[in-house]
Structure formats: C-alpha cells, structure tokens
Amino acid sequence: MKDPSREIIQVNIEEELKSSYLDYSMSVIVGRALPDVRDGLKPVHRRILFAMYILNNDWNKAYKKSARIVGDVIGKYHPHGDSAVYDAIVRMAQKFSLRYMLIDGQGNFGSVDGDSAAAMRYTEVRMSKIAHELLNDLEKNTVEFLPNYDGTEYIPEILPAKIPNLLINGSSGIAVGMATNIPPHNLNEVINGCLAYIDNNDITLEELIKHIPGPDFPTAAIINGKSGIEEAYRTGKGKIYIRAQNQIEKNKKNKKESIVFNEIPYQVNKSRLIEKIAELVKEKRIDGITALRDESDKDGMRIVIEIKREAIAEVILNQLYSLTQLQISFGINMVALCQGQPKTLSLKEILKNFLSHRQEIIIRRSLFELNKVRNRIHILEGLNMALININAIIEIIKNSVNSIDAKKIIIQKNWKSEKINYLAKKHEYYFSEKQAQAILDLRLHKITNLEQEKIIMEHNDLIKKTKELKEILENPKKMFEVIKSELLSIQNNFSDKRRTKITENHSDINMEDLINQEDVVVTLSHSGYVKYQPLSDYNAQRRGGKGKSAAKIKEEDFIESLVIANTHDTILCFSSRGILYWMKVYQLPESSRHARGRPIVNLLPLSPKERITAILPVHKYQDNLNIFMTTAHGIVKKSSLSQFKKPRFAGIIAINLHANDELIGVALTDGNNNIMLFTQNGKVVQFLENSVRTMGRTASGVKGIKIKKNDKVVSLIVPKNKGSILIATKNGYGKRTKISDFPIKSRATQGVISIKITKKNGKIIGAIQVIEKDQIMMITDAGTLVRIRVSEVGVLKRNTQGVILIRTSKNEKVVALQKIVDPMIEKIDL
C-alpha cells in the first residue's frame, strides 16, 4: 500500500497563490470579459452566433426557441451557466442596448424601464441580417478552429467579421485588474473612417474625426462637447457627457410650460429616472414642478414634466441635469484583446487591427478559393480531353470488367491531342485519378456539343478567376480594393442616419447658477475638519461677551483657520508642504454651528503627513495681482496670481519649503504694497513689497524677518493707507495700534516690538488690519466664537500689553482671529 504522505508535494503558498491567481486572471481576461479587437465579440457572444450558424438559424428562416440556442452553446461549446448565455442573447436582441442588433428576437426581451425578458422557453430568436456579415466565409478556411471543452466539437477562434463590430456595437466588461467600456458608433461613419485609413495609413486623428465624429448610441440623446471624444480616440481613454434630448412645450390654454424628454442617455433606466425625479420633487430639492408623466408608447419615448407658471424652465432643466441621470458621464476605456493580450487602443489602432484582420481573412479565403478553382480546372481539363477522345473513352468503358478496371486503363493510357496544345506537352496527356473518376461519373448528356462548349467556357472563366485570385494575393493594392468593395457593399446595405447629436463645446452645468450668493464663515480645525455656515448665524456682541459656539469639536481639536467668503468664491488651500489646492466655497460641507464639518482629507488629495495651514478666498482672478506668502521661519515669496489660475485636482507647488518650515500666511498684493510680518514673541517688521522680486511657483523665497530661537511668524499683513493693526493674544488680550506707529525697515531685519508679551496676556496668535466700522471674530480652542465691534477696542502704543477682548475659561486659549469688513456688517442684524 502506498504511503499518502509520499504523494504530497510541498509548495510555497505565496508562489502558488501568485500562480493560481494569475492563471485565473488571464482566464477571465481572455476567456470571458474582454472582446477581441478583430470581431468585437466576447467568447460567449461568438459561441452563440456560431451555434445559430450551425443550426441554420438565419435571418430569412424560421425563429427557433432561445432555449435551443442556450442548450447548444452549453452542451456543445462551453459549460456556461444558462442564465449567462441567455442574458447575452437578450442583450444582442435589445434595440436599446446594441446599435446594430445581432439577434432578431420574437417575444418579450425586456425594456428600457428595466423589465426582465421572458423566460428562454417562451422567446424565439434568429440571427439578424447584419450578423451574417460576421460569419460569412467561415466555411472557406478563413479562421482557425479550436476544440471545445471535451474535444468533441470545434469552434472558431475568431469570426471573419466583414463589419467593424467592436466600434459599431461597442463593448463593456469587467475583468481582473482591468475593464473595458467602448461606446457604439454609426456604421456609415466607421466604414468611411476605414476607407479613409486604407487610402492614407498616416491619416491624422483630426482628419479621422471628420469621418468618425463620435459615438452614436442606440438611445440617441446628445453628447455634450467634443473634447472627451478626441482624448478617447487619441489615448483610448476619455470621458464624455451624455445629456437627454429635450424640448420645451407651451400649453396654449393655460400658457404653462412643460419640459419634454424624447431621448435619454445610454443605459439609463427610464423607470428609475422618473422615480428619482419624483423623489427630488417630494424632498423639495427641485422646486417648480407640478406634474410628472411617462407618456411613452410604441411610437417612442416621451417624459413630460409640467412646471409652475412662474418657474424658469432653464433653471429646472439645469437642476434635473445636475441631480438626475438625465445627464451622465460615460467613461470610455477602449481595452480589447490584441494578439491574445489586453491592450488599450486608440481609434486608429482599432481600425488598423480590424483591417489587418480583413487582410488575413481575404488571404486565407483567396488561397482556399484558388485551391478550389485549381482543382476544378484540373477536372475540367480532364473532361475536355475526354470529350475530344470520347469514342475511345466509351470503347474502354464498354470493354472493361468494372469501373475500377476502366479507371485503371484510362489513367495508364497516353492520350494524344493536336487540338488542345495547352493541355498536353508534346501532344501527350495522362489523366489523374480524380480526372478519371470524373470521366466515369460523366452523364451521357454531357457529351453533346452544347455541354462541351459549357465546359470550355467554365474552364476559361476559372482561368480568369485564377489570375484575379493570384493578383489579390500578390498585389496589396488589389487586396485593399477588395476590402473597400466589401465595406462599400455593407455600407449600401446597412447604413443609417446618426442618432446621437454632438455639441461643439462641453456645456457644463454651472453649479453657481444653482447656489445662492451669500456671505459665509469658513472654518478649518486643527484636526482638519472644514465647513461653512451662513454669516447671518452670528449677531454682533459687546467686548467681553461669552460668544456662540462656532463648531462642535473633540476635546483634542480646535479651530485653526477662519475666513469670511462668498459661496461663489474660490478657496485657495495652502498646505504645510507648500502645495496649493483649489475648492469652491459651495463645494465645502454646509453645517450648523454645532456640527464638526467634514475632514478636508476627504475633499482634497492630501498625503498622510500633509495638512492645510492657510486658506485664502479669491473672488476674481486679476492679472495685476500677486500672491504674497510667508513661512513660520520668516521666508517670504511673491508670485503672480495668474500662475495659480488653472485648478488641478492633485494641486501644484506654491513654494519650496526648507526643512521643518511651513507656510503660515498668504495675501493678495498689487506689487506696490507694504508688508508686515508679526511673530508670536511680539516682534514686527514692515518693509516694501517691491524689495521682493516676483518668483516662479517652485522658488523657495527670500528672508523677510530675522527669527530668534523659539519664535515664529504668526501673521502676514498688507497694510492699507488708513486704519490700525489689531493684535490678539492666546489669553484673550488684544489692542489696536496705529499703522504709523510701526516704522518701515529693510527686509530681513529683526524688527520692532508690536505688543508687550507677559504671562498675563500670552503670546500673539494673530494680527489684522481694521478700521473703526469693522467687526472681528475670535475663536478659542474650545470652539467658542465671539464677535466684537472694533470701535470697542482701545488704541494703544506698541509697547503695551492690551486689554481683555474675550474672557476665556481655565485652560482655554484663543487660536484664531478674523475681520468682518463693513459691507458685510450692513447685511447682518446688529
């Protein structure tokens, strides 16, 4: 008896997992999820069409039960699940799924509302007329055949595919580690593109797009903008926006308007779409809609949305596009199997591979036909020679014992003829076995003069056919003429008009049109929680008040930055690494005073140790403005605002920082300002902005102030002609000092005293420029906010410690200071 332990093979589990998972991945990629670039089909679709081909389930013959096709595919070619095969059949029979249906279905095959197809035992199918163009010439040895799972049947590795199916019907699928999503196109346009590529292999993408302007979906609708199309055609990846086709109708009786949709984006479920619109109306997220009806019937789609008389149709339309699937993004990812390997393909590469496939098919077909023609010519030569010597042939047959004896004599005899010199060299001719058999099979009526002429005519025609086939094989130009001829024939038989319209430029839904303009308080906590809330939530209080809670935060967290902005403003977010990110204020979470907000790392692509240290609201980009930056180590830098005009999701470098330094302040300047830098230990330096040259984004900057040990810059101020500087400290103290009290010094000096620092008032947390009518906000690390009129804060000399601005609790410290300017004061309740 064998010892089982001796038959166990020890393997490294890590290597086994790698190997097994790789095998599984390639099996899914090659054998299931991705289409082949040559015929545009996945294996299951290829097996279905081949099964129908073998069954003669042709477009002009009777329908067959879907279950019969499913059974043949599973039993003969591959043991799929029956539902997987039937689902593939259903999709190929849905006019809203495929631009050019490959299966003609009879029965219930589902709907655009998401209704399921009837069971396979009820529905019937046959190949569509255009599907035959995928299978034509299959019997002419044009492709390789592979054995099925048990070796009892053979199935084509690929279909001959006269039509560029990958482009005209598209494909989608998810493999392991990759996916494909190729949109459908118009057959007429794709063939025009193929013809243009044949005429000029070096055709540019711009010229190619004149023939193939973009996808053409079975559900029509509108492609919003061309830029995504061009990117996808160039690189194989891109994103387009598909928008529902609409029209605004006016009721003649009540003068009310209705928005009517006749076409919706590709693969959108109409029933769920209508439910979503109704839900938005119920939740009052869309206002102005009075009625919603689905009036679709056999003649076409029609979704009617009635709106209030005073409502603006364009505004509601924008809201619908923004909040529902009446506008969707379609991510194009043109991945297909190319020579058995998954590859992302450009439009030109897809056309090139399809036409290369057609070349190979025509070569194999021509060789097959040439061999067949030569065999037939060989037989005709024998028949022709036999008819010339018919009397001798008949005599041999009469005198032979049997057909075998007659064949042997005919083959061995040397036949002479002076009439047909091209058949016999030196007037000698020997019949082959095949010729001899054909002579014996010859019917008597074939020896008439008329039949002899027919044989000679057929022989001559086949000689011409041989020359044509040889020319196709030897002359690439002739071969491409054949390809073009076949493509033109398909174009004449199957082309139709484009359904999907394409707009010239992408028309983004302007979210700002849907957002009310209002002044808000934007806060950023030390732990990175960001939010905004209406400025009107806060009423002005007298100096020394306890204030309102600005944010509910954890004990270890506190508010670090606060700015006043408009909901339509852009927030420039400067990180500790000197990277600049962009956000619109309305993209931030709107929260109540008691809410924490949302982690900014969920809104911006920050690295693990990166945090936002400064935020700056920008209302409008102006070419004559600069961004002036300062770091905690006293380094300053000036860059043109225009360098930061184009947002990038990943952010851009704003300043190159030295080790252990961070960006703490930013300001907008015009190039002729004064600059003031305040340190936490009570120092300030004021210098001319023009002493700092304008630098590129990646520059490191120059020294702005000399920093002593344990000191750092906390505030950057660009002072105006009038007003004073309000300084606040950690323990709630503060004061105002006239700007004129701060002397202008040279850049990179130590500066002068700005406030007298004591244990009582604490170190400086911030400094701002104010005027008499201003108000300020102060926030503590406990999240308490107090709003104070500047007029209530006394004006003191530089070398003083200030007065109490906010009474803090034990261990509570002031962490942020922000000004509210006069125009905002007029809008709030004092």
From Swiss-Prot:
Active site per database record: 122 (o-(5'-phospho-dna)-tyrosine intermediate)
Chain's role: A type II topoisomerase that negatively supercoils closed circular double-stranded (ds) DNA in an ATP-dependent manner to modulate DNA topology and maintain chromosomes in an underwound state. Negative supercoiling favors strand separation, and DNA replication, transcription, recombination and repair, all of which involve strand separation. Also able to catalyze the interconversion of other topological isomers of dsDNA rings, including catenanes and knotted rings. Type II topoisomerases break and join 2 DNA strands simultaneously in an ATP-dependent manner.
GO molecular function, one term: DNA negative supercoiling activity
Motif (GyrA-box): 541-547
Key words of the record: ATP-binding, Cytoplasm, DNA-binding, Isomerase, Nucleotide-binding, Topoisomerase
Family as reported in the entry's similarity comment: Belongs to the type II topoisomerase GyrA/ParC subunit family.
Note: Few gyrases are as efficient as E.coli at forming negative supercoils. Not all organisms have 2 type II topoisomerases; in organisms with a single type II topoisomerase this enzyme also has to decatenate newly replicated chromosomes.
Gene Ontology cellular component annotations, sorted alphabetically: chromosome; cytoplasm; DNA topoisomerase type II (double strand cut, ATP-hydrolyzing) complex
Name of the coding gene: gyrA
Name recorded for this polypeptide: DNA gyrase subunit A
BP-aspect Gene Ontology terms: DNA topological change; DNA-templated DNA replication
Annotated Topo IIA-type catalytic domain residues: 34-514
Assembly behavior: Heterotetramer, composed of two GyrA and two GyrB chains. In the heterotetramer, GyrA contains the active site tyrosine that forms a transient covalent intermediate with DNA, while GyrB binds cofactors and catalyzes ATP hydrolysis.
